[in-house]
Amino acid sequence: MGSPADNPRALPVTVIVGATSKWQPDGPNTRFAHGRDVGQDLPPERRWGLGGALAHRFAREGHHVVLTTRRRDNAEALAATIGSSGGSCSIVELDVGTTGSVVDAFSVIRTQAGDPDVLIYNAGYMAGRELTADQELLEHFPNDLFEEAVATACRGPFLVAKEVLPAMRQRGSGSILFSNNQYSLRGRKRSTGQSLYYPRTMMRALAQALTEEYSAHGVHVATVVVDGFIDSPGTRALPALQERPDLLIDPVSIADAFHYLHRQDRSCWTHELQLTASTGPVSS
C-alpha cells in the first residue's frame, strides 16, 4: 500500500480540530481575539492563537499536522508558515456542527494523511458575548446561540472522538486532548459579555468518561483547562488586561503543555491539567 498523498513520509499524524476557530477573516472572533486582521508582526507560532501554536509545536516535533477549519482559506497562511519552516501540514474543511461534515472530513484525513496519532479538540465559540445587560438571564438567551454552544462544546467532541477511537484502540496507542476553560469546572451564571459556558462542563465529562473506557486500550485522554485569557493583541486591548498584562497566558507555553501530555509515559498519565498565570486566580 502506498504512502498517503499528504503525508508521504508516513509521519505521526496530529489533527487539530478548530485550528483557526478564532481567526476567521473579518469575523467577530478575529476582532475580539486579535484586535485586527492577522498581521505579519507577530512570530508565526503566536500569530494564530492557540491553534497556530499547537500546529507549530507538533510540526516541529516531526508530526504531519492536519488543520481542520470551516473554510480552507482560514488556515492557508498558517499552513504556509509551517511548510516554510520545514514542517508537514495539510488542511481539511470540517464543521463540528454537522455530522456528515465530520464523517467526510475524517475519511479524507485517513485517506490523505493516515490514521491520527493525536487528536486535539480546540474548536471554540463566542455565542452570547454580544448580548446586552438586559439579556443576562438564561430566559433571554436565544435558542440558536444555545444550539451553537452545544454543537461546539458537547456534540462536536463526541463526533470527532468516535472517528479516531477505533484505530487508536486497535493500535493500542493514541492521545485525545481537549482544550477547555475554567468555566468547565462547574456551572456558573453567565455575566454580560460572556458566552454560554455551561455546555463546556459536558466536554469535561466526556473526557472523564473516555478516560475510564479507553485508558486500558492505550488511549490517553486529557483535558487542558486554560484558566485565564490567552495572550493576543485583542485580549491585551481589554481594559482590565491593559492594567494587568501579567494575567495573560502565553499560547506557545500552552502548546508545550499539550505536547508534554502526549509524550507522557503510560505509567504516569495526567488526565486533567489546569494552566493559570502565576499572578492569576486559580478557579475551582
Residue ranges of predicted features:
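Rossmann-fold cofactor-recognition segment
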Residues: S84-G100
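Catalytic Tyr-X3-Lys loop
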Residues: E139-F158, S173
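Catalytic loop of short-chain dehydrogenase/reductase
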Residues: G18, K22-P25, T30-E45, F141-L145, ...
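C-terminal helical subdomain
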Residues: A216-V225, P239-S284
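Conserved mid-core segment of classical short-chain dehydrogenase/reductases
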Residues: T30, H34-R36, V103, G124-E147
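Canonical Rossmann dinucleotide-binding motif of NAD(H)/NADP(H)-dependent dehydrogenases/reductases
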Residues: S3, N7-V66
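A short, exposed helix-loop element centered on a Lys and neighboring polar residues
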Residues: A161-K162, Q208
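Active-site loop of short-chain dehydrogenase/reductase
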Residues: L11-V13, S88, D115-P116, E130, ...
